[in-house]
């Protein structure tokens, strides 16, 4: 009962439409945003996920660790939040929490199986980034996280932002920055609650989900948000995602 009360409190915190992604991400309810969902945990955390099948949500492993209960928050046509039960959580077997916390590459990928289909949403097509990934390649991130670090009430509605690859992007990890600020001063980027959010790349047939948001920093690598956005690309994990989802009966 106590865990359920915590989940309800977290859902109500996110019930009022606000913003997500620091630095001015664009509010969006259509397009890629229609696949975005909110994940709440009984320990009070909240993260972002993507619907990839009517009963399957893709997110990051560090958001859905064992020892807690998780639910999906969905808003009806009148905006009232509802909690949907999660039947099963599958975490990639190669995920390493210490590596993620140190911003090193790891299999930060997980799937949630819902008890019932989530209606009124779109599903995202799962793919992989175009290889080789070039510095300056453009990606679109989406999330329900906070716009003000440390202020949970500033999160809750889906926002999207266009970022570009920096550093040495590859199949293990992609680091994204605001193309205007280049990570050296406050800019657009992921923040608390955006973890697990989808990273899209435009393909000939439309946007494809090619990665998930794992971590963020402030400018110049400082603690915070608005600097780097760390992404786990799905290149090495797409097969595991498809196999796991199909073992649950999902058609991908």
Task: Report residues per predicted region.
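Sec/Tat signal peptide C-region and signal peptidase I cleavage site
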Residues: 16-20
